[in-house]
A protein has these predicted regions:
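A short helix->loop->beta-strand "cap" motif at the edges of active sites that frequently abuts
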Residues: 179-181
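Residue-level recognition of beta-strand->loop/alpha-helix junctions
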Residues: 119-121, 187, 229-232
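Alpha-helical scaffolding segments of alpha/beta enzyme cores, especially the outer helices
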Residues: 167, 171-175, 211-218
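Alpha/beta-hydrolase-fold catalytic nucleophile elbow
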Residues: 150, 186-187
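Catalytic His-Asp segment of secreted/periplasmic serine-dependent ester chemistry enzymes
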Residues: 192-320
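N-terminal secretory targeting modules
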Residues: 1-78, 274-320
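Short helix-capping segments at alpha-helix termini
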Residues: 108-113, 177, 222-224
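Conserved SGNH/GDSL esterase-like catalytic core that processes O-acyl groups on lipids
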Residues: 78-80, 88-167, 308-317
């Protein structure tokens, strides 16, 4: 996340809080305080220039590694990943941990078909960049059978217009749907689970993130896509086990965090393609009581592998 993004979030947050207070002195104090917190958050989280592992290829049922993609390599389904660094898998140590790979492998096993994975996601991207990613797709070839979009966190920290961000996402979904692709969108995650962001800045970005997620879900549905509310589904787990679910930078998910997200994305993706045999896919929550709660007092459970058993449980222990 660029330094200017944190400064933009702090500045906008100070403006909003000060407007509510109606006091000039409070405005300056709030601005100074939140700007200092933005600098602190950027210093703790740091900058990463690492590239996510490259994971594209054709995944066969039961195979651990892909067949490198060439024009003469056959496949049955084409899965394409769009969005930001979480879509690209920043924080993963190996290609096998990347969310696109988790989904491609699981979809190949579920459908018993050969799944080609192509990644257009770019670290640091906001919803503004989705149009360019879709353009790049059309330059490379025809639309895929399925697309997964993960985007939103950078829109929040850069304090882009939530309405415009949702519109841009909806436009990307519409273009992909017009090309015949099934589209699944993981909406903006809950930035309130990032402990490196100090209070009250954390509350500011958390509130914006949840507002953006709701707008993204509405725009996705209107364009014919399938939204998956990651904030509502993942917040309890990330609050209960941050050391396990965050990567070393404290901001991006770890392999276990991406695995947890893939558990929630796969049933929606496979069902939309007509290849889900795991029973009825429940309607995703519009809101979650657990996601509104703040600091957990929990026990940590063991890491589970992807999809062989029941989904990772909800928060263990008491939440204060």
């Amino acid at each position: 996340v660029p330094r200017t993004s944190w400064r933009a979030a702090a500045l906008a947050g100070a403006t909003a809080v000060a407007a509510g207070s109606g006091a000039g002195g409070a405005s300056w104090l709030t601005y100074t305080y939140l700007m200092r917190q933005a600098t602190e958050a950027r210093g703790v989280i740091g900058r990463t220039w690492a590239k996510p592992p490259e994971a594209d290829g054709v995944y066969l049922p039961g195979a651990q590694s892909p067949v490198p993609w060439r024009r003469d390599v056959p496949f049955d389904l084409h899965l394409m990943i769009f969005g930001d660094s979480t879509a690209a898998g920043l924080g993963c140590a190996s290609a096998a941990e990347v969310p696109g790979v988790l989904l491609a492998r699981a979809l190949a096993d579920e459908s018993r078909r050969r799944v080609r994975l192509s990644t257009k996601a770019i670290a640091g991207a906001t919803s503004r960049g989705l149009a360019g990613q879709v353009d790049a797709m059309y330059v490379a070839g025809p639309p895929p059978d399925a697309a997964v979009i993960l985007v939103g966190a950078n829109d929040v920290t850069a304090k882009q217009s939530l309405h415009r961000s949702a519109q841009r996402l909806g436009s990307a979904v519409h273009r992909l749907r017009a090309g015949g692709a099934v589209v699944v969108v993981g909406t903006c995650p809950d930035l309130g689970v990032v402990g490196a962001i100090p209070q009250p800045l954390r509350t500011v970005v958390r509130t914006w993130g949840r507002q953006l997620a709701r707008a993204q879900a509405a725009a996705t549905r209107a364009a014919g896509g399938h939204p998956v509310p990651l904030a509502d589904l993942l917040t309890p787990e990330f609050l209960s086990a941050p050391d396990r679910l965050f990567s070393a930078d404290g901001f991006h998910p770890s392999a276990a965090g991406y695995e947890l997200a893939a558990r929630h994305l796969l049933p929606v993706l496979a069902a939309a393609l007509g290849h889900w045999a795991g029973g009825p896919v429940p309607e995703p929550p519009l809101t979650s009581a657990a996601a509104r709660l703040w600091l957990p007092r929990t026990r940590r459970g063991p890491r589970e592998r992807l999809f062989p058993g029941p989904a990772v449980g909800t928060v263990a222990g008491e939440i204060r």
